[in-house]
A protein has these predicted regions:
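Conserved SAM-binding motif I beta-strand of class I
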Residues: 73-78
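Conserved SAM-binding loop
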Residues: 87-88
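Conserved SAM/SAH-binding beta-strand->alpha-helix loop
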Residues: 80-82
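S-adenosyl-L-methionine
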Residues: 1-46
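Conserved SAM-binding loop of SAM-dependent methyltransferases across substrates and taxa
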Residues: 58-70
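Active-site capping/gating segments
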Residues: 151-185
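Conserved beta-strand signature within the Rossmann-like core of class I S-adenosyl-L-methionine
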Residues: 140-152
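Conserved class I S-adenosyl-L-methionine
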Residues: 48-58
């Protein structure tokens, strides 16, 4: 799991650097957009659905892709102030009115009222955040938890079997990472 920690740290640094360049930011988002939209096509959520994305990062590519293509109300959180400031700037540049970016920790943020909660790949410790979701989110809430997927052979496999969450599906993204879809019992 130490390699996963180093990977996450490196990705945060790269995103902060890329976020300083409009060209690199737009490239980063464009490269991921189709993958994100395919991943989220599994959810049949109404137009007024509320989505919480934990760990939005300096370049909130998942948020941008979803907000441009869905009518969901999206809240992105990150505990890193610099990442929050960068993400807010990018959301403003895209002119997205259905997005709020807040500085918050997944272990403390209010989880009520969301139809879908996304746990980003870089969230640590993922199992503790999922345990909290299993206790505090509304029943019927979907959870999409990003995982190392094919890279688990390198980073190690995470134990993400959590009481109170029913596993719906394991999904393999085109970039080699994966996601596990849960529903809160």
């Amino acid at each position: 799991m130490e390699l996963q920690y180093l990977h996450n740290k490196l990705l945060r640094i790269v995103e902060k650097i890329f976020s300083r360049s409009d060209v690199l930011t737009r490239f980063y988002i464009a490269v991921q957009e189709r993958t994100v939209l395919e991943e989220f096509s599994q959810f049949d959520l109404g137009t007024n659905s509320r989505v919480l994305i934990m760990g939005c990062g300096s370049i909130p590519n998942t948020i941008i892709s979803l907000a441009r293509n869905k009518k969901w109300k999206i809240v992105g959180i990150d505990r890193d102030l610099a990442a929050v400031e960068n993400a807010r700037k990018i959301v403003r540049e895209y002119g997205l009115k259905n997005v709020d970016i807040e500085r918050a920790d997944g272990m403390e943020v209010d989880l009520k009222g969301y139809n879908l909660i996304v746990v980003a790949l870089g969230i640590e410790p993922k199992n503790r955040v999922l345990e909290r979701i299993s206790k505090d989110a509304d029943s019927g809430t979907y959870i999409l938890c990003r995982t190392a997927g094919a890279f688990s052979k390198i980073f190690g496999r995470e134990n993400l079997k959590i009481d109170g969450l029913k596993t719906i599906k394991h999904y393999r993204r085109k970039d080699g990472t994966g996601s596990i879809i849960f529903v809160k019992k």
